[in-house]
Amino acid sequence: MAQFYSAKRRTTTRQIITVSVNDLDSFGQGVARHNGKTLFIPGLLPQENAEVTVTEDKKQYARAKVVRRLSDSPGRETPRCPHFGVCGGCQQQHASVDLQQRSKSAALARLMKHEVSEVIADVPWGYRRRARLSLNYLPKTQQLQMGFRKAGSSDIVDVKQCPILVPQLEALLPKVMACLGSLQVMRHLGHVELVQATSGTLMILRHTAPLSSADREKLERFSHSEGLDLYLAPDSEILETVSGEMPWYDSNGLRLTFSPRDFIQVNAGVNQKMVARALEWLDVQPEDRVLDLFCGMGNFTLPLATQAASVVGVEGVPALVEKGQQNARLNGLQNVTFYHENLEEDVTKQPWAKNGFDKVLLDPARAGAAGVMQQIIKLEPIRIVYVSCNPATLARDSEALLKAGYTIARLAMLDMFPHTGHLESMVLFSRVK
């Protein structure tokens, strides 16, 4: 949602007003109207009335805070997490999953000017298989903080539980905190990452000063007692494997290895369903030549290769291209070619662009795929699946395809991050004959 900021903050009288909320935005704020202006109120849900005071008044919108809630929405629920409202991780735990999905689907439909065909979802709790926890030493108390950032702040919320983490990771939180808080180097710790792979649990510790032999021994004992693969990161380039083999996870019948620092989808359940639905929408045939743009380490590329005659994956990060090639070999897939190319540059001169393709899949970052849309149109694929983590750039890029004669055949909201403001989606475009 675009928000416009004027140079000067308007003064408010703190007058109490009564409002009726009619919508929920992606940040979990109730949306109401007052004096012809949109009013955003944290903590309120659709169908709720409340007394509020305006805290910020802009030309296009205003913000308010609740003085007293006068009624409860049928979609209101008690948040499961004791840190909700302070921790910046979740914005919508006070809303039912059904309300969250309906609100996100409605927002997607408005942007795309097309009805949402389906919601692709999995378990709403215990879904996140990766967590990055900030670490901060407090000199006054000589204690170590471990947790997530506060909403709108760089301060850390000490987190002892997190119900959106997979149970294995949530159970580890107090144990990891106790271990790290006993280290001599705790003044020089940056963050700790926990990852749950199919192969086991990973812990990656970022430290900014050398570890003493005693600290190293403590960490090794902890990793062995908890059955963790331990990795140490003294800087952003170096990653030392202390214990454990190359991690891997199952994806649509394939075994994919990855580096602990590689990007993998944090919601394994939705990822499996998303990949399966993409293959179904593309209707991949044994004779098809398929192009996968922004392919990463092959999340879609490799499953596509199990059904198509040939698949080309294009990715801008060399380490991910190398990992995709390695996983193709490990899974015995010989019909895959990966290219390391910057898709934000002139793609017409890149080697993959000279090939012909029957079908195309693209999964760009938040900036979208404006630089490749014309090249995709030139290829004249029968079907295109666009996976998006930013509905605004998806809507922008879709215009090029619609003008070129494609139509939206299917539109899905991907509930990849329940209880948060993140909205992901997937669209099938078909060429009009």
Swiss-Prot record:
Single GO biological process annotation from the record: rRNA base methylation
Where's the TRAM domain? 10-68
Q: Which residues bind S-adenosyl-L-methionine?
A: Q265, F294, N299, E315, N342, D363
What residues sit in the active site? C389 (nucleophile)
Which SUPFAM superfamilies is this protein grouped with?
Answer: Nucleic acid-binding proteins, S-adenosyl-L-methionine-dependent methyltransferases
Reactions listed under catalytic activity:
uridine(1939) in 23S rRNA + S-adenosyl-L-methionine = 5-methyluridine(1939) in 23S rRNA + S-adenosyl-L-homocysteine + H(+)
* Alphabetical list of Pfam families matching this protein: TRAM (PF01938), tRNA_U5-meth_tr (PF05958)
Task: List ligand-binding residues for [4Fe-4S] cluster.
Answer: C81, C87, C90, C162
Recorded GO MF terms: 4 iron, 4 sulfur cluster binding; iron ion binding; RNA binding; rRNA (uridine-C5-)-methyltransferase activity
Matches recorded under InterPro entries: 23S_rRNA_MeTrfase_RlmD (IPR001566), MeTrfase_TrmA_AS (IPR030390), MeTrfase_TrmA_CS (IPR030391), NA-bd_OB-fold (IPR012340), SAM-dependent_MTases_sf (IPR029063), TRAM_dom (IPR002792), U5_MeTrfase_fam (IPR010280)
The UniProt keyword set, sorted, is: 4Fe-4S, Iron, Iron-sulfur, Metal-binding, Methyltransferase, rRNA processing, S-adenosyl-L-methionine, Transferase
Task: State which Enzyme Commission number(s) the record gives.
Answer: 2.1.1.190
Which HAMAP family does the record cross-reference, listed alphabetically?
23SrRNA_methyltr_RlmD
Q: What does this protein do?
A: Catalyzes the formation of 5-methyl-uridine at position 1939 (m5U1939) in 23S rRNA.
What this protein is called in its record is: 23S rRNA (uracil(1939)-C(5))-methyltransferase RlmD
The encoding gene: rlmD
